């Protein structure tokens, strides 16, 4: 099977399979690029220690060499996150620490206007290129917002542009402060619309100038065929008879509103609220599709390099899964002992630890934070009489009673999560935007019998 065929097969699997199978198909797709698959702990068995999501789902991490050149891994200083093509904007990192309740004491306050009703916050980095001739007329900002879901409600949008202090921007430099004018960009079929006008206050040091552009973003999305790019133009005027003023005289820089560093470029922060329940599997599938497109553009691997074929990878994973299932069956059955003996060796339904390590899953090239968390899981017997704290349903009570009287007549009720809570994740989406999103039902808070 050639590489493009393997990619097509895996993308079909991702569109049709269950989440567990989807995780495995994503791992196969990633492994199809190069290098043999290795298990999370470096060994081949399901050894001791606490269970992790990688072990529970049967997912395997792959070496960085298995990822196409466009997503070659590099480890950021002081962070476990790795991605060679995207540098997370410092504002999005600060936003995550603030909204996730992880801001350290004394950390700078983060503007949260419009974020209260949002469950998703996306940071779009400026993609415009500037030249010196544009410095006299203004500065344009260009954002590709095509990744926003049409069904999502935009509850807030803010343009943030870095401004540095300069001799001409300090106190006493002007008899009256210059005006900053923010408008939409002129186009072939539309005239520019003034969005914002305010005084450029004297500045010592540096700060991020923030402009509310929520109404402009909503109008952009209401267009019959909205363009992919959302374009804004910042200008300055000064004097009794307002005349154009070069923005760099007020401390604005180039390219992208601050400097050559990615974290200094202007950023459009869009807060939205989804109309559907978000599934982490949807983002995993999008990541795999984007990776599949990159894999299809890569040259075919040299057969002499020891690269594992997709067929060999699938076969190897199937053998490992079968061996693991056999081990669990032997452990759960007590090596062929009767049903009653196995039951006596198990505890009642309760919450047990389940540590999720995204690095172990190989997801640290798109998940920025957190890199691990405690998810918990439910395990144990639901036998008669059921305890009230397990919050059994009436159906579970009847089923458990029947099972206690005649085990062959009805199976025991199941120990499952009864209450779950969300976590917030900061990640890079398939369009290379940094996204803060709250995912429901990620942590087990209580278990019950159902």
UniProtKB/Swiss-Prot annotation:
Highest taxon of the lineage: Eukaryota
InterPro entries: Cystine-knot_cytokine (IPR029034), TGF-b_C (IPR001839), TGF-b_propeptide (IPR001111), TGF-beta-rel (IPR015615), TGFb_CS (IPR017948)
Protein name as catalogued: Growth/differentiation factor 7
Source lineage: Eukaryota, Metazoa, Chordata, Craniata, Vertebrata
Protein task: May play an active role in the motor area of the primate neocortex.
Positions of region (Disordered): 296-349
PROSITE patterns given in the database record: TGF_BETA_1, TGF_BETA_2
Glycan attachment points: 83
GO molecular function: cytokine activity; growth factor activity; identical protein binding
Keyword Signal: yes
A GO term from the CC aspect: extracellular space
Residue stretch(es) of the prosequence: 20-321
Disulfide bonds: 349-415, 378-447, 382-449
Family the UniProt entry places it in: Belongs to the TGF-beta family.
Assembly behavior: Homodimer; disulfide-linked.
Residues annotated as signal peptide: 1-19
Pfam families to which the protein is assigned, alphabetical: TGF_beta, TGFb_propeptide
Biased composition (Basic residues): 340-349
GO biological process, alphabetically ordered: activin receptor signaling pathway; axon guidance; BMP signaling pathway; branching morphogenesis of an epithelial tube; cell fate commitment; epithelial cell differentiation; forebrain morphogenesis; gland morphogenesis
Keyword annotations of the record: Cleavage on pair of basic residues, Cytokine, Disulfide bond, Glycoprotein, Growth factor, Secreted, Signal
Location in the cell: Secreted
């Amino acid at each position: 099977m050639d590489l493009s065929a393997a990619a097509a097969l895996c993308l079909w699997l991702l569109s049709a399979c269950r989440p567990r199978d989807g995780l495995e198909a994503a791992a196969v797709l990633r492994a199809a690029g190069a290098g043999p698959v290795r298990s999370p702990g470096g060994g081949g068995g399901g050894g001791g220690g606490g269970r992790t999501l990688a072990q529970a789902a049967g997912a395997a991490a792959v070496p960085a060499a298995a990822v196409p050149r466009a997503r070659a891994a590099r480890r950021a200083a002081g962070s476990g996150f790795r991605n060679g093509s995207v540098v997370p904007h410092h504002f999005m990192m600060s936003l995550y620490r603030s909204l996730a309740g992880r801001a350290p004491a004394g950390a700078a306050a983060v503007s949260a206007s419009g974020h209260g009703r949002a469950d998703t916050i996306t940071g779009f980095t400026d993609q415009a290129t500037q030249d010196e001739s544009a410095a006299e007329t203004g500065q344009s900002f260009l954002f590709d917002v095509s990744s926003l879901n049409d069904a999502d409600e935009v509850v807030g949008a803010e343009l943030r542009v870095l401004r540095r202090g300069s001799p001409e921007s300090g106190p006493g430099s002007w008899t009256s402060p210059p005006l900053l004018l923010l408008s939409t960009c002129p186009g072939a079929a539309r005239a520019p619309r003034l969005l914002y006008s305010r005084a450029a206050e004297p500045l010592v040091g540096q700060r991020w100038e923030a402009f509310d552009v929520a109404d402009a973003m909503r109008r952009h999305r209401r267009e019959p065929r909205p363009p992919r790019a959302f374009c804004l133009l910042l200008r300055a005027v000064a004097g009794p008879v307002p005349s154009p003023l070069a923005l760099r005289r007020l401390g604005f820089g180039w390219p992208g509103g601050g400097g050559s560093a990615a974290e200094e470029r202007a950023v459009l922060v869009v807060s939205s609220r989804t109309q559907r329940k978000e599934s982490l599997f949807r983002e995993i599938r999008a990541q795999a599709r984007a990776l599949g497109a990159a894999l299809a553009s890569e040259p075919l691997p040299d057969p002499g390099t020891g690269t594992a074929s997709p067929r060999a990878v699938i076969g190897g994973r199937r053998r490992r899964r079968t061996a693991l299932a056999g081990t669990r069956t032997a452990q759960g059955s007590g090596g062929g002992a009767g049903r009653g003996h196995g039951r006596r060796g198990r505890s009642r339904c309760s919450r047990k630890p389940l540590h999720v390590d995204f690095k172990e899953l190989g997801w640290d090239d798109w998940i920025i934070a957190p890199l691990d968390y405690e998810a918990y899981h439910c395990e144990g017997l639901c036998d008669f009489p059921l305890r009230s704290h397990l919050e059994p349903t009436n159906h579970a009570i009847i089923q458990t009673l029947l099972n206690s009287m005649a085990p062959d007549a009805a199976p025991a009720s199941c120990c499952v999560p009864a209450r779950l809570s969300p976590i917030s994740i900061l990640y890079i989406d398939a369009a290379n935007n940094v996204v803060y999103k709250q995912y429901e039902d990620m942590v087990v808070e209580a278990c019950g019998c159902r």
